[in-house]
Amino acid sequence: VFVSRVVLKNWRNFAKVEALLRPRMFIVGANASGKSNFLDVFRFLRDIAKPGGGLQFGITERGGLSPIRCLAARRYPNVEIAVELSESVGAKPAWRYEIGIKQQNRGDRKPYLSYERVWEDGEQILDRPESVDEEDSLRLTQTHLEQINTNSAFRDMARFFEGVTYLHLVPQLVRYSREFSGPGPVGDPFGRSFLDRIGRTPERIRRSRLKLIEKALTLAVPQLKELTFLTDTAEGGIPHLEAIYDHWRPHGARQREREFSDGTLRLVGLLWSLLEGDSMLLLEEPELSLNAGIVQQLAPMIYRLQRKRGRQVLATSHSAELLDDAGIAPEEVLLLTPAREGTEVILAADIAEVRALLKGGQSVGDAVLPRTVPDLARQLSLFE
């Protein structure tokens, strides 16, 4: 399944938006338009559904309800999220999940549910608050989604949310993970424990994935070959990626992740994540640190890998090269436009001018990206 529709009210940048989604989506917009915050709604649902998480955990991780609530919210301050999961494009939703959150007016001002609703194949199977919730209001500080004893009727949906993965790999954190002390962000979004994650994968699966990644790497970095994973016993079992770098000597030189370029590490992280699971994958600017020629191949590569594994991919981007691929449909691009009353979200296919440009032979990138440039951006060149 994949998320086919999302409706947000008072979520961060978005006062009220609705978006139809495909298995592959590219999210574009100006800086601070809310691209990362749009992805964060799915991370929030993951934080609710995962073991050890929950509604209170997800809100606390984001600094409370106030930072989550849209600044444009006025008379109706509740935060509301609705998502639909479908088996295929155009199919009726297999699942629908709705949640409304508000804050206590007095006391410790704890966030609680104004409602929680679930539909399966069009039939409503959960509608909170229930009578027991009215008798014990503390129950509304937890969702049924997060509780094993209450989510059995929609556990497949809960598992989908639990499997959501976010990746914005920071190469320096991969290279020097042991030098950064402290627990780090929940869910390891920046790849500090990326090598540990590879190490926890069963050996047969790990070797198979690394072999596939090696094939892709040799196309992008012809000098690299024989990508392997190892733990250095001399260093106390620290995990490493290692590859042979071809040069004038007959056997090349062995290099570890500390010698890999930023682009190589980010490409390894991207490919591993695409091969790793079958739930939603959230990518933050996958084009970073990569050569323009490689970036042009990302969209078709993502399509081929996700099609095999049924994985939905949502990616933010500023890259004209990434969006230059002729295989990207306007239905796969969301344009975020900041406005006085919150960011507006519109499908590129719903913009008449974009459709006309595509009909004239332009790429999605050429048709959409100029709309993301702020009106006064050219004046930056006059700054002194």
Task: Show where each model-derived region lies.
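Electropositive, glycine-dotted interaction segments
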Residues: 89-228
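Short acidic, glycine-rich loop/turn motifs
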Residues: 10, 83-90, 120, 245-249, ...
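Phosphate-binding glycine-rich loops of NTP-binding sites
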Residues: 23-62, 190-193, 267-273, 291, ...
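N-terminal pre-Walker A segment at the start of P-loop NTPase domains
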Residues: 1-15
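Conserved P-loop NTP-binding catalytic core
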Residues: 40-106
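ABC ATPase nucleotide-binding domain
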Residues: 18-20
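Conserved ABC ATPase signature
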Residues: 210, 215-218, 225-275, 280-293
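C-terminal lobe/lid and adjacent interdomain/linker elements of RecA-like ASCE P-loop ATPase modules
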Residues: 1-2, 297-384
